Amino acid sequence: MTSQAALKLVAKEEGDKQRALEAALAQIDRAFGKGSVMKLGEKGKVEIESVSTGSLGLDIALGIGGLPKGRIVEVYGPESSGKTTLALHVVAEVQKAGGTAAFVDAEHALDPSYAYKLGVNLDNLLVSQPDNGEQALEITDTLVRSGAVDIVVVDSVAALTPKAEIEGEMGDSLPGLQARLMSQALRKLTASINKANTIVIFINQIRHKIGVMYGSPETTTGGNALKFYASVRLDIRRTGSVKARDEIVGNNVRVKVVKNKVAPPFREVEFDIMYGEGISKLGEVIDLGVKAGIIDKAGSWFSYGSQRIGQGRDNVREFLKNNPDVAADIEKAVRKSSQKIEEELLVGGPEEGEED
């Protein structure tokens, strides 16, 4: 066979393949609707939409300016570390942008007055206090499938008690029941979350594994399914107290991006959570301004441009509170320097024994 004839045969085979592919795509479109299968390049550059976390540093650490829409997010940590506070800040940001938010309060512990102080619009917040885990996840699924809700917060996975456990006796042993419930629910939820472009935040608690000799003994409740399905996992820890003279007025908090499917993970950020106020934005503006070289720090004195803005962090915070224009200028400059700050926020990879 001549080389020309061989080329014609290859071209014919390629043409047959193309026609077969077109026929298959047409059949899929008829069966499942237009756009069920498409070439990735047809959509152009796929931009991931995000919602601010209410923390300037955490938005930078996440790499896309906040939490990704249409994804599952897990926020976990010890008790009183700021998990619900962080989730309520995200709810407030969604509402500010005109979105609809829902809060599935499985713990029956939501404080409306605290949520209001963080900027949550209580009149427009959908709240559910379900009786059992199945009911909580069914409500979450229905809200997501409606396509009308922008964020759903489930507080918390540990409180999603299966119906069989509630109806059983106090000492009954029901191994793996909650893990199976979460696994089944996430299989159902994940596709509809993506289609509806809804953020679903699962707040989770920490437990300790017995008999672990090496690596971290810590694990989260509800089995391994959530670890796999979550696009972003945030580990939040209280590292100290914020004091005004002798009075404790807040907590120092460290958040580590343990998993991130939309940007590089393992970034770590610290900020203050003030009692009755939430995340201290001005405190972050000062700290990140110093990191980016926008605010100069010499000893205990802080300067912005040629102007001295205060001695000591508390005095600088007070100055920025009284001069919101200066604070806004510094924040704008910090956001422009986000790439430089991102590199400084990078820490090591996962700790030994830490699961993805």
Curated annotation (Swiss-Prot):
- The keyword Glycoprotein is assigned to this record: no
Q: Which GO terms describe its molecular function?
A: ATP binding; ATP hydrolysis activity; ATP-dependent DNA damage sensor activity; damaged DNA binding; single-stranded DNA binding
Q: Which GO terms describe its biological process?
A: DNA recombination; DNA repair; SOS response
Question: What is the top-level taxon of the source organism?
Answer: Bacteria
Q: Which Pfam families does this chain map to?
A: RecA (PF00154), RecA_C (PF21096)
Q: Which residues of this UniProt protein bind ATP? A: 77-84
Give its localization.
Cytoplasm
Function, as annotated, reads:
Can catalyze the hydrolysis of ATP in the presence of single-stranded DNA, the ATP-dependent uptake of single-stranded DNA by duplex DNA, and the ATP-dependent hybridization of homologous single-stranded DNAs. It interacts with LexA causing its activation and leading to its autocatalytic cleavage.
Q: Hey, which family's this protein in?
A: Belongs to the RecA family.
Name used for this protein in its record: Protein RecA
Source species, please? Caulobacter vibrioides (strain NA1000 / CB15N) (Caulobacter crescentus)
The gene designation is: recA
